[in-house]
């Protein structure tokens, strides 16, 4: 570090203490973060002639080292204050750190339900309409990884029983076709026998005892109820079954693109909304990977 740079660092420390009246702890942290950043700058670049591209490179290095978003934010605050100080002092014309931001902390994925617990959850017994309906709902959630809104919006015509598939209207009104496993098809068929006895107002696949389309909240409440009755160790809700579907599929197939297509996820890194995989490939991956859809020889 050049004597000139050291001199400005001392002035910066005094400025933080006297004019900004920051606590000794904050000033100490800022000085440490500046030193940390200067050590990662390329040869020939110091804290006086550093450019925006240099700080971006240092930010990337610190991120790769595993610094938390909170630590990165502290470092960014230090270099931004340093830049403002040099700007006020007439050393630079633009603050090279202005506008830089730390990568957002990734939200933790919800814990998935293991295959054995899923099997226990779906082993509910009973021939009453509500039980048969709820079993069909949970089987379909886990079978096809549908979103809550997608499942609630299904009509009688949405399920193609011969082809073992369901036509879904996802986010942004994007339609996709998703395979449906044998267990789910059987559960839906059992439910439909009871549904015929209910006077229904519309063509909704899943309805209440009064024939109205089942609401999102009702589906969530029923799933939570069955999770408690089956003594699962975690709360059961639609997204947890969707997440479990994705996790178990990836564990079995490792075909990320196919699972993304099945889930109806948009790929933000390209201009295409969906991957170019055809349905035959998706069905093959599904049949070979899904725990409750693997093909078995006819008895």
Curated annotation (Swiss-Prot):
Transmembrane segments: none
NCBIfam families listed in its UniProt record: recomb_XerC (TIGR02224)
Gene: xerC
Domain Core-binding (CB) stretches: 3-87
Function of the molecule: Site-specific tyrosine recombinase, which acts by catalyzing the cutting and rejoining of the recombining DNA molecules. The XerC-XerD complex is essential to convert dimers of the bacterial chromosome into monomers to permit their segregation at cell division. It also contributes to the segregational stability of plasmids.
GO molecular function, one term: DNA binding
Keywords for this protein: Cell cycle, Cell division, Chromosome partition, Cytoplasm, DNA integration, DNA recombination, DNA-binding
Subcellular location: Cytoplasm
Any one of the GO BP annotations: cell division
Disulfide feature: none
Name of the protein in question: Tyrosine recombinase XerC
């Amino acid at each position: 570090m050049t004597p000139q740079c050291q001199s400005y660092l001392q002035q910066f420390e005094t400025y933080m203490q006297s004019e900004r009246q920051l606590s000794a702890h904050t000033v100490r942290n800022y000085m440490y973060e500046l030193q940390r950043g200067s050590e990662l700058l390329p040869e020939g670049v110091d804290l006086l002639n550093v450019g925006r591209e240099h700080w971006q490179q240092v930010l990337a290095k610190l991120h790769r080292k595993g610094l938390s978003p909170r630590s990165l934010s502290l470092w960014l605050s230090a270099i931004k204050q340093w830049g403002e100080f040099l700007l006020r002092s007439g050393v630079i014309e633009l603050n090279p750190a202005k506008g830089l931001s730390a990568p957002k902390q990734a939200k933790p994925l919800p814990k998935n339900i293991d295959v054995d617990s899923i099997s226990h959850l779906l082993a509910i017994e009973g021939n009453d309409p509500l039980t048969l309906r709820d079993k069909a709902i949970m089987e379909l959630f886990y079978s096809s990884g549908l979103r809550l809104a997608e499942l609630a919006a299904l009509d009688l015509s949405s399920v193609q029983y011969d082809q073992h598939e369901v036509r879904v209207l996802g986010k942004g009104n994007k339609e996709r076709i998703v395979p449906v496993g044998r267990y789910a098809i059987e559960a839906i068929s059992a439910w439909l026998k009871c549904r015929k006895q209910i006077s229904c107002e519309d063509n909704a696949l899943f309805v209440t005892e009064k024939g109205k389309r089942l609401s999102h909240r009702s589906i969530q409440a029923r799933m939570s109820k069955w999770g408690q009755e089956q003594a699962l160790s975690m709360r059961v809700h639609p997204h947890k079954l969707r997440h479990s579907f994705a996790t178990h599929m990836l564990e079995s197939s490792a075909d990320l693109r196919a699972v993304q297509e099945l889930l109806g996820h948009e790929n933000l890194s390209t201009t295409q909304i969906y991957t170019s995989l055809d349905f035959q490939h998706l069905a093959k991956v599904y049949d070979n990977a899904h725990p409750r859809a693997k093909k078995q020889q006819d008895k």
